[in-house]
Structure formats: structure tokens, C-alpha cells
Amino acid sequence: MSWQEKINAALDARRAADALRRRYPVAQGAGRWLVADDRQYLNFSSNDYLGLSHHPQIIRAWQQGAEQFGVGSGGSGHVSGYSVAHQALEEELAEWLGYSRALLFISGFAANQAVIAAMMAKEDRIAADRLSHASLLEAASLSPSQLRRFAHNDVTHLARLLASPCPGQQMVVTEGVFSMDGDSAPLAEIQQVTQQHNGWLMVDDAHGTGVIGEQGRGSCWLQKVKPELLVVTFGKGFGVSGAAVLCSSTVADYLLQFARHLIYSTSMPPAQAQALRASLAVIRSEEGDARREKLAALITRFRAGVQGSPFTLADSRSAIQPLIVGDNSRALQLAEKLRQQGCWVTAIRPPTVPAGTARLRLTLTAAHEMQDIDRLLEMLHGNG
């Protein structure tokens, strides 16, 4: 089989399964409204949970940062790309979340890959929740360590995996809020089992940080858990992009020496770090509290209103509200119907989610209003 035949076969298989991904160029894609092809849609696909991507204070901070530092960092943080703006953001994140150190990464995917690649050796074991993000599972699969997956949020299964002999160290990997189901991990129970077997816990709280807990400190803070490695990302609650790893001073020093994604990547622009500092200030403020309260009210309204529709609603109290449709083609058809009626909704299909669980991944944000939720509910009940 030639290269072209191999590529064509893979694409044909995706098309036949109604699983072919495509991108839509949008004029505006975050916040309450999405604009595409000169048409405006209510946006129920954005991860901008607090509606901060268009916050004037954050935009102004980025603009001022660009004027002060330029539009790029100029290199890796190990060369010339680590600015006083990066340093200040790291220190503020560490203080906010109660860690000694924070290290910035260009994306959550890079942060997860870097930590696992740097920490895990052949004699070690990773025990990962089966529904963990692709960045975590791919990194674990590519690492020389043994990968064992435990059933979703099943602490008993995790305990059995950790109890089996392992010549090296054990790392338990999970998410705070799961990206496709919107449910939360039982972090306190997971940490207890992990500690009983002398392991370390790594939590990716991409969808919890900024959105839940006191001052938006996230899933771990809410459940009174402090994992050895906490990954937070800035493309969701912060409304920007990038990520950070929170850890001890010793682990931070280790990652600075051995995390190749950190060493060999150009740092995020200092102006972006300034915008993230402004976003963090909003998240920690009374305004941040008000945005979280509004989002919680919208979630409650949606979950109450969707009852009686012909769809299976996932058990989620987060901004991620998946409606399980099952069949790929039906999910695509329903998403298209909703778009025709003015709501931008994304159909998520295998391999992103398990076979037979194609869904509409609805996301609510603090930028929405109650009438937006009511409009969505009206369309869902009418398109069942």
C-alpha cells in the first residue's frame, strides 16, 4: 500500500462512519455569539466558561503588554524567553493555588505530555482514568512506563491496579472535570488510595480551574486535595490560552532540567502572560464570584428544563452538558438542525468518545443570558 493509498483508506473509513472531523472558519468564536458566513449564532460550543475572552480589562492588559514587550517572547525560557511578566504570573498562580512553584507551558497538551515524559521511566507505572484527556493517555502510551487504565471514577478498580507489584514508582492520572462528560473525579478518594500505595497524583483541572471552588481555585481546592502535580489551563475559565504545572520547588527544578516540551519550545508571549495576570485578577475578584454564580444558575436552569426531552443528559453539574444521542449520523443531523435555527452546537463522535455515545457537547458560559438557555431548550424539545 502506497502512502496515498494509506491516507485515502483512513479518510474513507472516517467518512463511512460519519466520523470525519472538519473545521469551520468563524469571524468570532468565543463568548455568547458565534459569527460564521455573515450569520450570528448563539454559541453553545465555547469553552470560555466565564466569558472573559472579550473582557476589556484583559484585552487592555494584552495590548499594553505588547507595547511593552513586543508580540513574541523571542525564544525558549532557557535562553531569553523568560520575562518578568512570566515570572510574575508563575508567582501569582502558585500563591493562588497554594503551591511552591508554577511553570508555564504553551498549551495544556504540552504540559501533560511534558510532565509524563519527564517523570516516568521503564520500571514505573501509570494508572490513568479510562476517560482521561487524549494528551494524558497519549503521553502515557508513548512513555516507557507501564500504562494501566482504571474504569471511569472507579476507586476500587484503581486500588487493585496499584496493589499489584511494581518495581518502580506509581503515578495516578485523572481529570478534575472530564472534558466530554462534564462529571467530576472523586479526588479525595483517589488521593487516599494513591497515598496508601505510596504513589503520586497528577490532576488535569483544565475545566475546573477558574470556574469552581473558592475564588475559582478549581476541583482540587473544592475537594480539599493537593496533588503532587496539578495542571491548569488558560483556554477555558481564563478565556485566553496556555497552561501551567503547579508543584513543589524540587519538582519544578527537575522539570526545568528534563521537560523537553518546556526546554525546546518558544515561551508564550509576555503580553499573553500580562493578559493572564489580568484574567486571574478578575477570577479572584467579586466580579469573578458573580460570574461563577451566574453560570451556576444557568446550569441549573438548563438541567431542569431539559427534563422530558428524548435525549440522555449526562450526570454533570459543570458548564459541560452533554446530550447523549448515540448514533453518529443522528448527532450530526441534530447539530445541523440546531444551527439552522440559530444555535451553534458541536457533535462529538468516536474516537473522541466511546463508540455508541455520540453526543451534542453543549457548553454554557457566564456570557449567556437566561433567555438564551430557554431558546436552546425550546429547540431541543422541538427537534427530538
Swiss-Prot record:
Q: EC?
A: 2.3.1.47
Q: Name one GO biological process term.
A: biotin biosynthetic process
Cofactor(s) recorded in Swiss-Prot or TrEMBL? pyridoxal 5'-phosphate
> In which residues is pyridoxal 5'-phosphate bound?
G108, F109, S179, H207, T233
**Binding-site residues for substrate, renumbered to this chain:** R21, H133, T352
Where in this protein does the record say N6-(pyridoxal phosphate)lysine is found? K236
Q: What Gene3D superfamilies is this protein classified in?
A: Aspartate Aminotransferase, domain 1, Type I PLP-dependent aspartate aminotransferase-like (Major domain)
State how it assembles.
Homodimer.
Q: What is the official name of this protein in its record?
A: 8-amino-7-oxononanoate synthase
Q: Which organism is it from?
A: Escherichia coli O8 (strain IAI1)
